Amino acid sequence: MRPADRQADQVRPITITRHYTKHAEGSVLVEFGDTKVLCNATVEEGVPRFLKGQGQGWVTAEYGMLPRATNSRNAREAARGKQTGRTMEIQRLIARSLRAAVDLKALGEFTITVDCDVIQADGGTRTASISGACVALVDALNKMVTEGKLKKSPLKSMVAAVSVGIVDGQPLCDLEYVEDSAAETDMNVVMIDDGRMIEVQGTAEGAPFSHEELLALLALAKGGLEKIFEAQKEALKQ
């Protein structure tokens, strides 16, 4: 039996609160069960040096966890003097995912940075970050239109992500921490809202997985992502 008696294909309760802070152009608190992530999108004029003069914009991301987001306190990475490999991998994943949702040429020479700060972690922090960051990005782009910086939003599609895995031989969707830590196979799937995939990260933690299990996990992810897209679009109506 899963925590909270969830079915194998069921995502956790999703709450997306927009305009959570007042300064950022886009600000979202996203909650997947007990995982809570604050996603703030900042718009700045100019682009990184490697894009100067090319007439296109850039979307990037940073990711971090508050010291007491987990059961025991973890020192801030700034106090250690460097980011961990895990942090760098996650923020690159978030950034790649968001760039797939935006027409960078239509964005023009602006940079949008989405900061994803994990307030509370209970599994799926990177996937929750992507799903919440997309909504914050939409709000930031819409604000650029309202302020006259853009004629229309360069958003091409919504993007969301979910974790899936095999626990005790059973494929499950949207893993909580206790499930994730016991998973024989762990996978993160990023998708745009027409069903096409941006990224699939799959690792056999305890035992190799078969082609049939891979297809089952991807099918679970697709079903879960449809629910997440619904939650995103419902939040954007409010």
Curated annotation (Swiss-Prot):
One of its GO terms (molecular function) is tRNA binding. InterPro entries: ExoRNase_PH_dom1, ExoRNase_PH_dom2, ExoRNase_PH_dom2_sf, PNPase/RNase_PH_dom_sf, Ribosomal_Su5_D2-typ_SF, RNase_PH, RNase_PH_bac-type, RNase_PH_CS. Keywords: Nucleotidyltransferase, RNA-binding, rRNA processing, Transferase, tRNA processing, tRNA-binding. Its EC number is 2.7.7.56. Homohexameric ring arranged as a trimer of dimers. NCBIfam families: RNasePH. This is Ribonuclease PH. It comes from Proteus mirabilis (strain HI4320).
